[in-house]
């Protein structure tokens, strides 16, 4: 009788451990992300560390930019006059219709923009419904 009780106890412990292991297993498709959580995951995956790195590099490059308190203002004024006279500045001061040749930018080829938008919408809805992996999210980068 003691042997039967010990056998039942061992089988109960084994089944309990298997049940806990099954509950701890992640979903087969990854993590379910909907709405704002999905967008945050895309931003974190695609640009999080890159933006932080760019901020650090910009801070390092500007470190000794303001070290000299007495800047040569005549030199800066001539650079400003040169920039205002450039074709890039003139392009910025034109109206959008003149810059784009009278055609609004959305009237071009919408297939490319719409195609990438459809991929994003499809992945976001499937990620919300079934879940998605980090590699699927990084495919949007």
Curated annotation (Swiss-Prot):
Coarse class of the protein's main subcellular location: secreted
Position of the signal peptide: 1-24
SUPFAM superfamilies, per database record: Insulin-like
One GO CC annotation: extracellular region
Organism: Mus musculus
Assembly and interaction partners: Heterodimer of a B chain and an A chain linked by two disulfide bonds.
Protein name, as recorded: Relaxin-3
Gene: Rln3
Cystine bridges: 34-128, 46-141, 127-132
Superkingdom as given in the UniProt entry: Eukaryota
């Amino acid at each position: 009788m003691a042997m039967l009780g010990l056998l039942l106890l061992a089988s109960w412990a084994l089944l309990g451990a298997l049940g806990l292991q099954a509950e701890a297993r992640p979903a087969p498709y990854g993590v379910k992300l909907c709405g704002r959580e999905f967008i945050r995951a895309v931003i974190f995956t695609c640009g999080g560390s890159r933006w932080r790195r760019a901020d650090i590099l910009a801070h390092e490059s500007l470190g000794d930019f303001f070290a000299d308190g007495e800047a040569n203002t005549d030199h800066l004024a001539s650079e400003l006059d040169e920039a205002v006279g450039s074709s890039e500045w003139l392009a910025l001061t034109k109206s959008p219709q003149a810059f784009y040749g009278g055609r609004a930018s959305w009237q071009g080829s919408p297939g490319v923009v719409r195609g990438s938008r459809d991929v994003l919408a499809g992945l976001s809805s499937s990620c919300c419904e079934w879940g998605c992996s980090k590699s699927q999210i990084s495919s949007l980068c």
